[in-house]
Regions:
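N-terminal signal peptide c-region/cleavage motif recognized by signal peptidases
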Residues: 20-22
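Structural preference for beta-strand elements that scaffold enzyme active sites
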Residues: 49-51, 77-79, 109-113, 143-147, ...
Length: 180
């Protein structure tokens, strides 16, 4: 069962990254044999990659989880679930923590994710505020990949995707439908 989950995660990540790669070559991201290299990790190569979530409520818990991920050779990528933080609405605190996590993780890529209530997360936010929050994060990008919910307002998704590419960050377009 775990192997299937790893493969599904890797395929989803590769497909989303391939679909959303910017037209230019980013400094930290290189196209290599139709795969993407992020912090020296070739996302498309075998073995499949393991994404481990950071699901903390506090900064201290997030730092502790990142330290465990950083020291685990079986963890390839960390996903920072921002919506689970007690201070998720405070963009300055989130950015500062994201920068710390990125340093702790060293060569392991960091995905920044706000999972909204509509898709099984903890944050309830309008399309306008969702875009505004991500724009704030992108002023000082701390992530290598940004998870954008693909069925939010189409204009917001398009604008965010364009900005993410300008900032040389990869996009993961996601959809979580728990009714199917």
């Amino acid at each position: 069962m775990m192997k299937i989950k790893k493969i599904a995660m890797q395929l989803c990540l590769s497909s989303a990254v391939l679909a959303a790669m910017p037209a230019f070559a980013a400094e930290a991201v290189q196209l290599s044999a139709r795969h993407y290299v992020v912090k020296n990790l070739n996302i498309g190569d075998l073995p499949v990659k393991t994404i481990v979530p950071i699901t903390a409520k506090t900064a201290e818990q997030a730092i502790a989880q990142a330290q465990v991920i950083a020291s685990n050779p079986n963890a390839d990528v960390a996903e920072f679930r921002i919506d689970l933080l007690e201070f998720s609405a405070d963009t300055k605190k989130v950015i500062a923590l994201g920068q710390q996590l990125n340093q702790i993780l060293k060569e392991k890529p960091l995905i920044a994710t706000i999972r909204t209530h509509n898709e099984g997360g903890k944050m309830t936010v309008s399309d306008q505020d969702y875009e505004k929050i991500y724009r704030e994060y992108l002023k000082k990008p701390f992530m290598q990949l940004l998870d954008i919910e693909m069925f939010r307002n189409a204009g917001s998704v398009a604008k965010l995707t364009k900005l993410v590419h300008v900032k040389k960050v990869l996009v993961i377009l996601s959809n979580h439908d728990f009714s199917k």
